[in-house]
């Protein structure tokens, strides 16, 4: 199965990038930011993103729209300080592009200023590793 990993972050903390790189290490794949278009079809696109102003960043939307013909299914992995998931926002864009979005999702808290200090932490990454095992099955 061809799996690709793409992420977007604008945070100075780099929580989303850390999560994407962790996934890449565990799956033996390179995690690239969304400025890198897909070069070939991906049966599963692991999309690592974060909540910004109650939505996903426009870079995520542009990436999905620009690569819709190469994506067979999106798996949403996200973090936020607010505790809100990006699933609905990603689903809206996927629906517009006729890209299936897996019901499997991983969401974790992320630190921002004084909120959720130290997150994602070791326990979060352990849960993420367990989640990754479910998508490989």
Segments from the language model and where they lie:
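FMN-binding flavodoxin-like domain, especially the glycine-rich phosphate-binding loop
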Residues: 3-6, 11-30, 34, 41-137
């Amino acid at each position: 199965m061809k799996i690709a990993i793409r992420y977007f972050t604008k945070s100075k903390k780099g929580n989303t990038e850390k999560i994407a790189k962790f996934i890449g290490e565990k799956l033996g794949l390179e995690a690239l930011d969304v400025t890198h278009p897909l070069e070939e079809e991906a049966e599963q696109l692991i999309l690592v993103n974060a909540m910004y102003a109650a939505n996903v960043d426009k870079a995520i939307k542009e990436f999905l729209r620009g690569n819709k013909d190469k994506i067979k299914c999106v798996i949403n992995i996200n973090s936020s300080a607010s505790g809100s998931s990006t699933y609905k926002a990603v689903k809206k864009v996927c629906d517009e592009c006729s890209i299936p979005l897996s019901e499997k999702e991983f969401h974790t808290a992320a630190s921002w200023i004084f909120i959720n200090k130290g997150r994602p932490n070791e326990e979060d990454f352990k849960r993420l590793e367990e989640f990754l095992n479910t998508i490989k099955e």
